[in-house]
Amino acid sequence: AGEDGIDVLGRVIAAKKGKGLPPLVGRGFDKSVDGLTYTAAIDGKIERHKNRIIILPILEINGDVDVGTGNIDFVGDVVIHGSVKTGARIRAAKSITIDGVCEGCVLEAGNDLILRNGMIGMGKARIIVKGNLFAKFMEYTDVEVDGFVEADSAINCNVVSNDKVIFNGGHASIVGGKVYGCAGIEVQNLGNDAFIKTEVHVGVHKKIKIKIAELEKLVDQKQMLLNNINAGIKQIEQMMGSAADGM
């Protein structure tokens, strides 16, 4: 209950017994033993739905991300309504969605990555995605995706996908760089009139091709060693034969 009050005539006004608030209902938070303190159980975004409080594992940023704001390492989904500047690094255990333009940054997503305005990599950018990648465009970027890749265009990028690589939209083009699509590559325009070297590889993962090249090199080295051993044995046999003839 509250405290008694006094009216303008000095008469006491008795306090009414207050009505306790019902406990909060929802998810994503813990309640103290006395029921008076609520603490978030996870990092994320608070939303209110009528009489329910829900903390979602989402980090939402309404501006740009750069070296000044600091890098991001989050256990859920990350949504950025601005751009991501050069030198920034964003890592999310789940999906990443970026509305603005990305420039020379590093992005790591445990699920999907959505780049609504593409990536200007400047040779500094790297993308690592466990799910699928959706991008408007990519330039001068290293890309590793476990799922499929869907974009409008790629210029001088190294793209590796364990699934299919699909280029559609206005340009639907690959110009320069290397693109590996284990399950196939769909593209309308490959290379350009300037004869920029453009490589596409279908059916074999880049890492497997590298491993095969390493094994082939190892075989060549072993063969050279074997040839040297055989030449040495032959030389010894000749020396032993000459010694026997002299006896």
Language model features by range: what are they?
Residues 1-146, 152, 178, 189, ...:
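Charge-rich, low-hydrophobicity low-complexity segments
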Residues 165-167:
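Phosphate-interacting basic helix/loop segments used at nucleotide- and nucleic-acid interfaces
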